[in-house]
Amino acid sequence: MRSHLVKPGSVYDGIEPGELGESTESVQDRVRQLESRNSFLEEQCSQIESEKRYLENQKIKYEREIRKLQSELDRMKTSPLIIGTVIDVIKNDRIIVRSSNGPQFLVNVSQYIDEKKLLPGAKVALNQHTLAIAEVIPSTEEPFVAAMEVIESIEVDYDQIGGLDEQIQELQEAVELPLIEPERFARIGIEPPKGVLLYGLPGTGKTLLAKAVAHRTNATFIRVVGSELVQKYIGDGSKLVREIFEMARKKAPSIIFIDELDSIAARRLNETTGADREVQRTLMQLLAEMDGFDKRKNIRIIAATNRPDVLDPAILRPGRFDRLVHVPMPGIEARGKILKIHCGKMTLAGDIDFKKLAKVTEGMSGADLKAIATEAGMFAVRKDKALVEMEDFLEAVEKVSMAADTQKMMPGNLPETTMFV
């Protein structure tokens, strides 16, 4: 029997009620399947779009990399430039330069170069074909020379140096005061000493004094060992000396400390070898720099040597090293002060008698006294003690004394009258 809800002539006319329910359920299933399929396709579409964006980013990245590599390739294919030096500046953008090969040329200048930088002596890059100035090369320091500048703060002060009060005062007057309070000298009408030579036996504190000066002044401190100025090739040592003083002028106020001065300033002899002649060239360059036509107002020189007897007389004359400071072996009072300084951070027992230690260390240098303090601490560590006792110091004195006696018996330290058979 037909349902009264079905109108005649409708799409459902002729369909039984059961059949209509079954058809509705199948349509709903089909709709759910289509919706699920649609969600899956939307996810796929979103994933594809994400991959597309990633590939586009990768494309941009690789294109940028290609441009970078192409630029580097073009740069590597660029013809090299010739290094030259400006000799003179002429009007109408014309410059006289000397190429690295030696001859001089009158060349043009690029309009993009600042003319203020084109001073005589400036390094420039020249076009290989036209020799026109392409760019001005900034002046650079020799790495070997730049490494001589002491950048780190040196933790050594005058209160850590015992028994050298007079030497400290002379060093302050000759080095510190001219840099810190130059008006004192101007008021009196004198020029301060230009150089100070510290001389004395090894281990007496010459280098320590120089370190204290570096700590107390805000000046640029340039440390040079004399043997570093002795170079293999002709002219290299003289060039280093020039560049050291040039750096000192640029970074003034500055202090140049030359350790082991006797290695380059030994007395000149008539009979010399090729190596000796190169050392003499370096010495002559040092003498020329110390004299100079320009006054070294803010540059002070300190030198140290164990052998003042072998120095060339030319370097000791007034105007070069004006003040000679003898750093002697410490006396009994000075030895006591030095021992107290080196034992300042040590955990000591109450029986330490510094006066007695100063007496039994007769003839020892400051370096020997520091070795005694270290050895005493080592004896205490060996015995697993909590404190360093007097007996540890006495054992250390004996050990250091034996080492010093052994060193004196070595062939290089024997008197000149000693002969070996």
Swiss-Prot record:
GO cellular component: cytoplasm; proteasome regulatory particle, base subcomplex; proteasome-activating nucleotidase complex
The species this protein was found in: Methanosarcina acetivorans (strain ATCC 35395 / DSM 2834 / JCM 12185 / C2A)
Entry-linked Pfam families: AAA, AAA_lid_3, Prot_ATP_ID_OB_C
Residues that bind ATP: 203-208, 342
Gene that encodes the chain: pan
Protein name: Proteasome-activating nucleotidase
Subcellular location: Cytoplasm
Keyword tags: ATP-binding, Chaperone, Coiled coil, Cytoplasm, Nucleotide-binding, Proteasome
Keyword hit for Nucleotide-binding: yes
